[in-house]
Each structure stands twice: as C-alpha cells, then as structure tokens.
Regions:
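Conserved hydrophobic positions within beta-strands
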Residues: 30, 68-70
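N-terminal helix initiation/capping motif
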Residues: 1-35, 102-109
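Short, conserved beta-turn/loop elements at beta-strand boundaries and strand-helix junctions
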Residues: 22, 35, 73-79, 95
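Hydrophobic core residues within well-ordered beta-strands of beta-rich domains
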Residues: 13, 26, 52, 64-66, ...
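Short conserved beta-strand and strand-loop elements enriched in small hydrophobics
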Residues: 15-19, 49-64
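C-terminal output/interaction extensions
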Residues: 3, 13, 78-109
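A structural micro-motif recognizing beta-strand termini
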Residues: 42-44, 91
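Short, well-ordered loop/turn sites that connect or cap secondary structure elements
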Residues: 11, 46-48
Length: 109
C-alpha cells in the first residue's frame, strides 16, 4: 500500500480478534491494521455499543487490548462467502500494546 496517504499506514495482518459486545463475544479476524484502527471480518453482525472492547490474539505474541468505535460496516463477498466487515477506529490502546502493535505494523509494511 505504498501509495496510501494515511497518517498511520495499514499493514495486511490477519489476527484472530474477539469483539466484546453487551450480548457476548463475537469472534472475527483482522484483514488489516494500523496504529489508528483495523478492518475486521466477522461471520455475524455484532450488536455494538458506541465504544467496545477488542481482544487481539496474534500468533506468537501476547494478547493485545483496545477500545474502539465502528466507523463503517458492510456485507462483503469473497470468492465463495459473504461476511460482515467493519472499519474500527481505536479510541484507546494501552501504551505497551501500542508499542507491540507498532512493531507488528512495521514488520508487515
């Protein structure tokens, strides 16, 4: 994504993520991620509050925590399946998790 003009570049990183909703957890996967937010793919539409918690589970790393807000959502199609996608802007990421996230983004850009 070299031509991107974003303040925080995105990296194509696929991590398991759990979206914590008031109706319980919804599991999904990141499609890309930056220091400012992420694109999440889920098999179902999460029932979200204004701000919600995210638990990222990258392989070989500790879990990362964040709080976010949904900026957009859509139902998308790939070759065989429909899935729910949502763009999330982070509203809070603990300092240590920001550092780990930044290292992961640098490794993949």
């Amino acid at each position: 994504m070299a031509n991107e003009k974003r303040q925080h570049p995105r990296a194509e990183i696929t991590w398991p993520v759990t979206v914590i909703t008031h109706n319980g957890p919804v599991d999904g996967r990141t499609q890309n991620i930056s220091l400012a937010g992420t694109l999440i793919r889920c098999p179902e539409v999460p029932d979200l509050d204004d701000n919600f918690r995210l638990v990222f589970k990258p392989a070989g790393r500790q879990m990362l925590l964040a709080t976010g807000e949904m900026i957009w959502s859509d139902i998308l199609l790939d070759d065989k399946y429909a899935f729910y996608a949502m763009g999330v802007r982070f509203t809070y990421v603990p300092e240590h998790d920001q550092h780990v996230l930044g290292e992961a983004v640098l490794e993949h850009t």
